[in-house]
Amino acid sequence: MTDNESLKSSISNRSTSFIRNTSTKPRTDSFIFPNGDRYDGEYTVTEEAQIMRHGQGKHTSADQQLIYEGTWKNDKMHGTGRLIYGNGTSYDGEFQSNYFEGLGTYAWPDGGQYTGLWKGSKPIGKAEYTGPKLGVPFVGIANGQQTHMRYKVSSL
């Protein structure tokens, strides 16, 4: 299972029908869902009495393997936020409907990081990669499947 698939599973694999007071006004609270996930932040409640994360909030999976802190829209990561995986990798940037979308930085625990544009959680367009211990960044173009990088040359 990929990181994005496990995130979707964690976020959608829950039931919140225990809320009965419906209102479209945003509220702030903390919840522990039946699957053990925790959410702290803003939300609304649908007419069907379902919690919809909406606004600023933090979602932590029960096993602590996924943590998202940022903006939510209609129960999806949407806007600016930070997603941290249990293996130490992270993504800081823009989200749209649970996907990396727009400008963002994906970082690995060894210090490497990839900064560029994303679409559908795939890198596209101009990007820069800085590897751990390399000291010299690479720049290049990504098309969602392959990334072509070269050393970044600085003028003196």
Language-model region placement:
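Intrinsically disordered, low-complexity repeat tracts enriched in Gly/Pro/Ser/Thr and acidic residues
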Residues: 1-156
